[in-house]
C-alpha cells in the first residue's frame, strides 16, 4: 500500500512538470544575439545567455512558431535593465501575435529601468569658433559648445517643426533659441495683397508681416530663421521659415505654404532657431546646412546624458493581436513613440513615454488597453484611440485608464489632446491630464464614455478652445461625460476658454455628475440639440452653462453646408440608426439650426455666474430644478471637500452624490509611478475680487428733458453735449483697444429713454454702412428694469447707415423684441469727424412702468476700421449681461 502511494505521488509530480508553460526568453544589454536567449545570464564558455536585442527575441518566436515549437500559452520575454539604442523601430506584425490560447508578453524587469531609445547619444562637444561666437550674446559666450551631428552619421535633420530633430538633456527637452524667451511679439501690419475679412476681422492671405521691435536687428544674417505664430485665430498656429527679412522695416516674408486662415494685425508670434538668441541655459540652434548644433548646456555635458531624436517612432504594431508591452520607457522618436494599427487584444501597460518630438501612443483596433502609463515631454498628443464601426455601432472597446498625461503638445500646440477617443464605444477612465497649451481631451463618433478623469492647467495658450472638445456634427451622438473633475482652466491671458465644449451644433451628448471649479464657460453648448447638462457642480465658473443658437445666426450657412453633408454621409437612414436616434430622421424639417431638446437640470452653481443662454435659444432649453447661488451645504468647500451634508437642500432637487473618491489616478501594481506630482499652473485670469458682483456696477445719472424737446434726426442740436456728463466707451470687450473713444448721453422725459452716441471716424477708412451685426459700424445697448424681478433684457442695435433692430440675444422673447422694434425710433448721420446715432425708446413698449428709477445698462461700440469692440463696462461675460455692467439712474 505504501509502495502504491509512493508511485502515485511520483506520477503526479511528473505530470505536473509536463504541463505546458509559456516560452521564456531573455534580453539584456550584456547579451548576444548569437546566444539561445533561454537563460537570463551568460553561461559557461559563452554558449548560453540572453539575447542582445528585442528584434532577435521576436525573430526567435517567429522561428519557433514556424517549427511548431511555440507553446499554446505563448511566450514571456524578460528584458533586463538598461538602455537599448535602436537602429530601427521595433516592429511587430500579424505574424508576431499571440497563439489562440495565450499571449506574447514583452516585460521590462523594473519600472523605468528598461529604455528603448530611438535617438542618438551625443558625447563629442567642442568650442564654438570665433566667427560664430561673435554672433552669440556675450552672456552665453563663455558657456556655449557645439557638436557636429554629421560626424555621428546623421544627415537628415528635418525642419524645426513637427517631425524635426529635438535635443534632450538629462531627461528633459531643451528649447530652441527664441525671442522673446517667454511671450510673443505682436504683428503690427500685414500685406495689402490677397486681403480677407473673417467675422469682421481684416487680414491678408499673403505671408508677409511687419512688427516693431528693436531686437530684430540682431537677426540679420541668420541662416535658418523661423517663426511660430497664431497668425489669425488663437486656436490655429503655424511655423514658417523666413525667406526675406528687412530688419530696418521689421518686415518678414515667409516660405509657402502660407497660413490657411491668413494673417492679421494684432496676432502674436515669436522667432526661433536663432544663433543670436542663445541667451539662456538650455537654448540651442541647429544649422541644417552644416549639421552644427550649438547650445548652452544647463551643466557640464560630460556629466550628463545628451541625445537627439532620430527614428520616426520607437515601436510599431501592425494587425498584431494578443500582445502585451509591460513596463518599458520609450524615448527619442521624432514622431509618435508607439503606433498600433488594426490591433486586437493588445495591452500597453505600466509604460513611460517621454522625450519624443511627436505624440505618445496612436492605437486603432479593438479590445485593447493603455493602462497605468506616464506620458510627458511630448511634441504632440498623448494617447489616441480609434476603434469601432459607426455603421453597425459595434463598439471598439478600447480603454485608456489610470494614465498621467502632462507637458505635451510642446511642438504642435493646438488640437493635440492628451487623450482622444474616435469611432464607437471607447472609454477614458480615471486619467490625469494637465499642463498643455490647448485641449486635454477630444472625441468624435458615438457612444464613448469619459468618466472619473481629472483635468487642470490646460488651454493656457488658447481662448476659443475646450479642455474637452468636439464639434460640428448632428450624428456623432451617445457619448457620456460623467463624474470628471475639471479645475483651474481660464485660457490665454485669462480671457477665457471652455471646460466641456460642444462646438458648432454638436448634438446628443450627456454631461452629468461633473465637478467644475474655476473654469470659464464650464459647460458650453454651441448651438447643438438633444444635449443634457445634469447633476453637475459648478464652483466659481463664469458662466457655468452656455447655450447659443448659432445655427440660426452667424453659423447658419453651416446648416445646409457641412452639417447636412455629414448627416447624409452617415448611416442615419438605416434601420439600426432609425431605432437608436429617431430624431435624425426629421431633423432637416425641424428647424435644424436651433438647439432643440436641450435639458439643464439638477445642477448646483455657487459663485461666478450661472448661465449665458442666448435669447433665440431660450425656447429650446428646459431649465429645471437647479440650485443657483444658494448654500448647497458642502462638507468643507474652503478645503475643496464638495461632498454634500445630510441637510443639503440639493437633495430636494434630486441631486445624486458624485463619487469624488474615485476620480483621478489610483495606486495600483500597473501604475508606472506613485505618488504623482501635478502642481496647478498659476492662473492668468484676474483674481475673483476683480470681477464685479451682480448689481454693483457704476451709475450714470440720466438727464431729465421735457417731452418733445428731442427730435430723432441723428443730429445733436437738441442735446447739451457736455463731455464731463458723457458716458465713455473706453475699454475693449475683447481683442485690441481702439485709440478712439465713443461718447454717449442719455435723457428721459418720463415716457421714453433717449440715447445719443458719438463715434469718431478714422479719416483713412470708410464707414461700413450695412445692417449685418459684427460686420458693420454700429453700436448696441442693453437694459432691463431693476424694479421688476426677472424682467427681460432688451437688446437694441443702431447702424451707421441708419438701420436699427431689436434682437432676442439677451433673453427678450420674440414678441417682446418685436414690440420694442415697432415702437422705437432711430436715425444716424455723419457729422464731421464722427458719426451720430440717436434712439428714442418708449418705456411702456418695454413693460417699464412710469416712475421706474433704475435700469441695468451697458453700451457696446463696433468699429470696423480697427476691428474693435469698445464698451462702457466689462461684464465678465456677454456685453448685454447688464446685471454685471452699470446702472442708469432715472431719478
Question: Over which residues does each language-model region extend?
Answer:
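Glycine- and acidic/polar-rich repeat regions and solenoidal domains
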Residues: 89, 99, 335-339, 354, ...
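Short, surface-exposed charged micro-motifs
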Residues: 241-244, 283-285, 440, 743-745, ...
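Extracellular polysaccharide-degrading/modifying enzymes targeting complex plant/algal/animal polysaccharides
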Residues: 22-347, 352-354, 362, 556-579, ...
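General beta-strand recognition
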Residues: 115, 251-253, 292-294, 522, ...
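Structural preference for beta-rich elements and adjacent junctions enriched in aromatics
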Residues: 689-891
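Positively charged n-region of N-terminal signal peptides that target proteins for export
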Residues: 1-4
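Bacterial N-terminal signal peptides
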Residues: 6-17
